[in-house]
Amino acid sequence: MTEKKKVVVAMSGGVDSTLTAKLLLEAGYEVCGATMHQFDGQEKEIEGARAMADFLGIPFQVVDVREAYQKFVLRYFIDAYAKGMTPNPCMMCDFKVKFGLFYDEARKHFDAPYFATGHYARILFHPERQKYEVHKGIDMGKDQSYMMYHLTQDQLAHIIFPLGRAFKKDTRRISKEKGLPTYNKAESQDICFLTSETSYVEFLKNHAPEAFSEGDIVDTKGRVLGRHRGIPYYTIGQRKGLGIAARTPLYVVALKPEKSQVIVGTNDELFRTRLLADELHFTDGEAPGEEFSCQAKIRYGIRVHDCTVTLERNGRAVVKFKEPQRAITSGQSVVFYDGDRLIGGGTIVRGL
């Protein structure tokens, strides 16, 4: 008798992860469930995941990642805002925790070669190139390939995304048809360590009150227009809540925490054709070349734009777009594609 392939499913107790586990069971895998213990106060979420594992009749394990989560996600989130950047905590959690410590520990605990999540992306093996590739999910409105540019070839050989060929609008219907009690469960929030009662500003005030020193709001010519309440209240492209009067609409075009300044300008001044990126990762393990043409996006949920990427000797890259991009934001990710295929990505240092 052929031994079943064993896979650990990252379970949250939600619609997508529960359906992922069910689909893998139906495909003949030996399925185990695991969930991350990221921070205190998660008892309800952990028990929800455990309940779904029990419902499916699969073994379940909680993996304590609190120390790594504190270091790589919470500390990063706080430090980024203090530096005038707009962090991407979900990306960092995937990179350092979910597909880092959790990926390693969950597979080790169950002695399982495979690891699956409910992400909407596809992993394909290209026989001619002898490379694993990440491709966009077929549901372009839900595609999460943007989050996967840090994955290595070794990881891609052991990761399964069963929902990559599904449409989000169908997952609740399919879940209901399969008798899964999660079919009508609400979607999870974007930043999991924030509650409905705690905004990111309140969180930062509790953990980094020094970041909220007041300062000047100045225009691009250096003229003082007013006062701001603290750098973390503002992000690139913001118009509302500036508290200044002007004849034309003004937007945040830059943040200078070292001077405690918020720089404002016109909508036209938000556009840049170039950006500088660092912390680069490429799915193939190396870049396509020292200079290459591709498509890129500068934040999740927008369309890609044609560009040229030029690598620098210091490990950074200059990305030049054919069309100006609005509100290039330090701390967000720029991600590169060749059609549907993910090439890689990096962290935006600043617009140029």
Predicted regions and their residues:
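AMP-forming adenylation/ATP pyrophosphatase catalytic core
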Residues: 116-123, 128-352
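ATP-dependent adenylation/nucleotidyltransferase module used to activate substrates
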Residues: 1-149, 160, 169-170, 176
